[in-house]
UniProtKB/Swiss-Prot annotation:
Region (Disordered): 402-423
Protein name per UniProt: COP9 signalosome complex subunit 3
Modified residues (N-acetylalanine): 2
One GO term of the biological process aspect: ubiquitin-dependent protein catabolic process
Gene assigned in the entry: Cops3
InterPro entries on file: COP9_N, CSN3, CSN3_C, PCI_dom, WH_DNA-bd_sf
Cell location: Cytoplasm; Nucleus
SMART domains: PINT (SM00088)
Entry GO terms, CC: COP9 signalosome; cytoplasm; cytosol; nucleoplasm; nucleus; perinuclear region of cytoplasm
Source species, domain of life: Eukaryota
Organism: Rattus norvegicus
Keywords, sorted A to Z: Acetylation, Cytoplasm, Nucleus, Phosphoprotein, Signalosome
UniProt main location, coarse: cytoplasm
């Protein structure tokens, strides 16, 4: 091993033993060029370091190995990274979260290139758990995990990291990029859409669209298109975006989504044949955007919406009559829709198989059973918790030096602008 590398190993050992993590971070940041020049000796360096005791030194070596233009032996490097992430010292790597997250990004990109996304899911889950200070903290690796889960069509491993509400962002020593935030909510929305949890999907797309921005983001644009489609499926109309949404959404993103606005406009007429014509007209756009599946679900949801409208007018109706009123192909298709809607709790009805008549019923829920009371209790607890969090955030902002300085400056400006009463 070259003398400079020996010195690197000795310094890593010494600083780790002394617990001088800040100085160790400075060392590994300066040593990138040295390690890159001695690529053939890096496995020897890894052998001389202990993953638990010298986590930051091992991290620096693996990061450089993965940064090379071509990885000579990917399988060996993959095994080394897998072992490192599962056994490294979490307290140590929190001093270099930027490099640790960078290693995870490199691993993700390599697995995406090799079309092996499933292999990285378990590793990234461990990486997030090592980085997070608490389960409500968002890291840039969350977006990587969601990307791999989407590509592998294996959604459930991501759910524990999506079902929690994020209250904090891991700064990663200033390396956290807005792209990771947008991707987390965009990919998360796609996962929830795939699982047909449209309410949560809509919330995730909304977070991506309403992120403060000064320029058009392609991720925001794609989120906006899916937001329109999921809104129609879930609510039967496009949900209005909050007032704090950036002006670039109205100025630039909306004009780039004309086909989707036309779809929403035709959807509001409740006419399936017109909607089918519009889908055919813009089929190339919807297919190119990979949204044709969602567009077809919009068409299906319009049939359901029209069936729900019939429940407000009729007590009983034949399947044949329903099919003609809703513009379905026949009584068989009408029966299929009604059965699915009964199963999903979208309507309350029964079908008489003898005469093919559908009877509509009132909602049997009386809102007085123990399960319903438990749900109300849970919702109240969430509101109380939210109130406490808002108070804590308000207190945090109030004592923030930058906020205090800015507030004092504003007050001085106001007093300076007031005319003197003695003039």
């Amino acid at each position: 091993m070259a003398s400079a590398l020996e010195q690197f190993v000795n310094s890593v050992r010494q600083l780790s033993a002394q617990g001088q993590m800040t100085q160790l971070c400075e060392l590994i940041n300066k040593s990138g060029e040295l390690l890159a020049k001695n690529l053939s000796h890096l496995d020897t360096v890894l052998g001389a370091l202990d993953v638990q005791e010298h986590s930051l030194g091992v991290l620096a070596v693996l990061f450089v190995k993965f940064s090379m233009p071509s990885v000579p032996d990917f399988e060996t490097l993959f095994s080394q990274v897998q072992l490192f992430i599962s056994t490294c010292n979490g307290e140590h790597i929190r001093y270099a979260t930027d490099t640790f997250a960078g290693l995870c990004h490199q691993l993700t990109n390599a697995l995406v290139e090799r079309k092996q996304p499933l292999r990285g899911i378990g590793i990234l889950k461990q990486a997030i758990d090592k980085m997070q200070m608490n389960t409500n903290q968002l890291t840039s690796v969350h977006a990587d995990l969601c990307q791999l889960c989407l590509l592998a069509k294996c959604f459930k491993p991501a759910l524990p990291y999506l079902d929690v509400d994020m209250m904090d962002i891991c700064k990663e020593n200033g390396a956290y990029d807005a792209k990771h935030f947008l991707c987390y909510y965009y990919y998360g929305g796609m996962i929830y859409t795939g699982l047909k949890n449209f309410e949560r999907a809509l919330y995730f797309y909304e977070q991506a669209i309403t992120t403060p921005a000064m320029a058009v983001s392609h991720i925001m644009l794609e989120s906006y298109k899916k937001y329109i489609l999921v809104s129609l499926i879930l609510l039967g109309k496009v949900q209005q975006l909050p007032k704090y949404t950036s002006q670039i959404v109205g100025r630039f993103i909306k004009p780039l989504s004309n086909a989707y606005h036309e779809l929403a406009q035709v959807y509001s007429t409740n006419n399936p044949s017109e909607l089918r014509n519009l889908v055919n007209k813009h089929s190339e756009t919807f297919t190119r955007d990979n949204n044709m599946g969602l567009v077809k679900q919009c068409l299906s949801s319009l049939y359901k919406k029209n069936i729900q409208r019939l429940t407000k007018t009729f007590l009983t109706l034949s399947l044949q009559d329903m099919a003609s009123r809703v513009q379905l192909s026949g009584p068989q298709e009408a029966e299929k829709y009604v059965l699915h809607m009964i199963e999903d709790g979208e309507i309350f009805a029964s079908i008489n198989q003898k005469d093919g008549m559908v009877s509509f019923h009132d909602n049997p829920e009386k809102y007085n059973n123990p399960a319903m009371l438990h749900n109300i209790d849970q919702e109240m607890l969430k509101c109380i918790e939210l109130d406490e969090r808002l108070k804590a955030m308000d207190q945090e902002i109030t004592v923030n030096p930058q906020f205090v300085q800015k507030s004092m400056g504003s007050q001085e400006d106001d007093s300076g602008n007031k005319p003197s009463s003695y003039s």
